[in-house]
Amino acid sequence: MRLDQFLSARTMYSRRELRQMIQKGKVTVDGAVVRKADQAVQPEAHTVCLNGREICGDQYLYVLLHKPKGYVSSADEAGQKSVLELVPPELCRKDLRPVGRLDKDSTGMLLLTDDGQLAHQVIAARGHVAKYYHIVLARPWEDGYLQSLEQGITLADGAQCLPAKAAPVPDTDREALICLHEGKYHQVRRMFAALGNHVSELARDCNGRTCCCRLELPLGACCVLSEKDVQKLLKCETDFARFATNAPKSFVIMDKCTSRILGNKRLEKCFYFWYDIYVTGNGKRLSRGDVLENLI
């Protein structure tokens, strides 16, 4: 494969722009500057860098972005700043698109990929990929919310939501942790509107278990995920099954992810709060080390 062909398929640059960059010495192959656009490269055998950044040679690219407020999760809303603007040009492939969406005023982890099949798996409810949120409510959490969410909320337009897991954050009366397995438009906000409350702040912490527990991405930053990370995302329900069937297992995982990403000490405390009521199916209490070993 020609060098310019390889780069064209994996960046947003045109062939003409890439040839100019190659001639200016901005491209290296295995550490050596290459100035010929027709240089032969093999994605699986060579390391190609553009402007000092390694270009992913895999067929598909998976990028995890910590979305800040003020950006929309699409590329075609006129006059709006897109999350794609936060991805370095060397990583932004032509078909790179967000998987699902976070609205403009929300923050959180957003997966971007050019793998259409994986995107469908994550978005579709039948894919069973969990999505985790930390929310702040305008009014205090009410005891009846948990039962309503677990039964499935009916939205104002009549749409029926799948059952959701939820729990208030200890030592607060307006913060909660939410776990969904679907992605309707503005779903979390609409669910609490149906309950007579309002979501003031919303942050999505991760999809599934996508290596978030090992990342501390600042707002606006992104990183490339490995194929292994992506498989963790798709197998999150299998991982959950290792824990007790009668325990709030999704929140144990979510709390730990949240505290690692955001450095939120109160959510770290929430993790240990859930640990205190966390028991195995035979009634044997897990040690804190056992739980952490399974999370990381």
PLM features: residue spans?
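Basic, flexible Lys/Arg- and Gly-enriched helix-loop patches that mediate nucleic-acid binding at interfaces
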Residues: 1-243
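Short, positively charged and aromatic/hydrophobic N-terminal segments
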Residues: 242-245, 252-256, 260, 275-277
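Cationic, low-complexity basic patches in intrinsically disordered or flexible, solvent-exposed regions
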Residues: 250, 257, 266, 270, ...
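N-terminal, intrinsically disordered charge-dense segments
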Residues: 261-265, 283-296
